[in-house]
């Protein structure tokens, strides 16, 4: 329905929706979850022991790995954020220190360091202290990687 409103002698028109629900501004409990992420990079060498001997990944080689850690939650009313990005960085730092410039095959749990196994390895170590963890993304090249959402 269109109604007229007079403001200082000027007629303004506005729409009034019949039978429309009132506008509700979400509170913290009513807002939808959001996902935020932080990206990290590290250099490491590895080889894949379970591929045929003539496969290129059977030989020692290195990557500039990219890791994207995503958490999910509701933005706080006071803070306006899901999580402080620096807090996310602090949570991942101990794992990053174990990976950067190391031979991944020598790390316990990464004897077969595929991107998939690396994502799961990170998840299992990060999730107990980061319950809002949503996804781990690993990129071992510009166009190859995996995403993991936990067990």
Placement of each model-derived feature along the sequence:
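Generic hydrophobic-segment detector
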Residues: 6-8, 52
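Charge-rich, low-complexity N-terminal segments
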Residues: 25-151
């Amino acid at each position: 329905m269109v109604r007229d409103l007079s403001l200082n002698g000027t007629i303004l028109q506005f729409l009034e929706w019949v039978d429309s629900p009132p506008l509700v501004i979400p509170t913290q409990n009513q807002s939808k979850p959001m996902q935020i992420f932080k990206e990290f990079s590290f250099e490491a060498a590895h080889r894949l022991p379970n591929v045929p001997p003539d496969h290129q990944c059977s030989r020692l080689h290195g990557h500039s790995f990219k890791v994207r850690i995503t958490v999910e939650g509701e933005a706080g009313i006071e803070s306006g954020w899901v999580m402080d990005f620096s807090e996310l960085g602090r949570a991942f730092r101990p794992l990053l220190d174990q990976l950067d410039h190391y031979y991944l095959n020598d790390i316990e749990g990464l004897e077969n360091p595929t991107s998939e196994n690396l994502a799961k390895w990170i998840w299992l170590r990060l999730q107990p202290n980061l319950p809002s963890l949503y996804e781990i993304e690993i990129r071992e090249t510009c166009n190859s990687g995996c995403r993991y959402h936990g067990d």
